[in-house]
């Protein structure tokens, strides 16, 4: 979603991703798309716009990796984010946080399982992922199917 990318200061435009997917597909290069859900700037509506983008470009996406945002324990402070520790003495990589838009991890996970992954075009992409798969291996699976 463009508003999420802008809020997170990513410096990229969704239309550039669309063009890249199209051009990579035309060149015969497989894509492994990593999507991060539940960032502080994302709402359920924004996530649904991401779902629509993936559906619109499903024929150009080789593989998908879906992840849920974790707030880094020692990353930059994010304004308006209430965070804490998991327990006294904990040495975590991540901090628990209260999503500023009320979209907590449980709701994000529910959206992914009950809505995002249920979309037929997306489910077809997810079924292509081998059980032990990383983005480093994507080209080999595409080459094997040629």
Question: Language-model segments: which ranges?
Answer:
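A structural motif corresponding to the C-terminal lobe/cap of the Radical SAM core domain
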Residues: 1-146
């Amino acid at each position: 979603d463009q508003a999420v990318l802008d809020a997170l200061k990513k410096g990229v435009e969704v239309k550039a991703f669309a063009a890249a997917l199209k051009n990579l597909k035309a060149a015969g290069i497989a894509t492994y798309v990593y999507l991060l859900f539940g960032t502080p700037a994302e709402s359920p509506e924004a996530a649904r716009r991401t779902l629509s983008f993936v559906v619109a470009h499903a024929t150009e996406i080789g593989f998908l990796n879906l992840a849920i945002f974790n707030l880094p324990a020692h990353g930059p402070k994010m304004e308006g984010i209430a965070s804490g520790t998991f327990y006294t003495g904990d040495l975590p990589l991540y901090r628990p946080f209260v999503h500023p838009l009320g979209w907590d991890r449980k709701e994000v996970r529910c959206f992914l399982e009950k809505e995002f992954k249920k979309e037929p075009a997306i489910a077809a992409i997810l079924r292509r992922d081998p059980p032990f798969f990383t983005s480093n291996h994507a080209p080999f699976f595409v080459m094997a199917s040629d």
